[in-house]
């Protein structure tokens, strides 16, 4: 378990685009779950107090699985679509953690 990586990312939808971003995030989560056996958890969340704020909680079996995720063509397509449709504003905040046990 010590090789497990946990990724926490915060994403802010552009004003009025929360529902569209939520739909895209749910779609992306389904693709990742099916395409990436090294991804243990890939779960988007929406804030209960701010409908335009989202958090991703992700876990990968090891650094190689996370690297495969970052290089996956479906991730590139997701980012391209997010940009093209103007779904987000600001910078995506990402923190990566290594399991202690």
Where are these regions (language model features)?
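Short, well-ordered beta-strand segments in beta-rich or mixed alpha/beta enzyme
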Residues: 4-12, 41-71, 95
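Glycine-rich beta-strand-turn "strand-cap" elements at beta-sheet edges
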Residues: 1-5, 43-52, 78-101
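An amphipathic, aromatic/His-enriched active-site/gating alpha helix that lines ligand/cofactor pockets
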Residues: 27, 31-40, 59-93
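N-terminal first-folded block
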Residues: 3-35
């Amino acid at each position: 378990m010590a090789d497990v990586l946990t990724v926490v990312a915060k994403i802010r939808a552009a004003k009025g685009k929360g529902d569209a971003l939520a739909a895209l995030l749910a779609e992306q989560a389904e693709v990742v779950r099916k395409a990436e056996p090294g991804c243990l958890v890939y779960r988007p969340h929406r804030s209960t107090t701010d409908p335009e704020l989202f958090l991703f909680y992700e876990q990968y079996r090891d650094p190689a699985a996370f690297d495969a995720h970052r290089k996956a063509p479906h991730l590139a397509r997701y980012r391209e679509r997010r940009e093209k449709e103007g779904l987000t504003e600001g910078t995506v905040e990402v923190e990566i953690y290594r399991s202690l046990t």
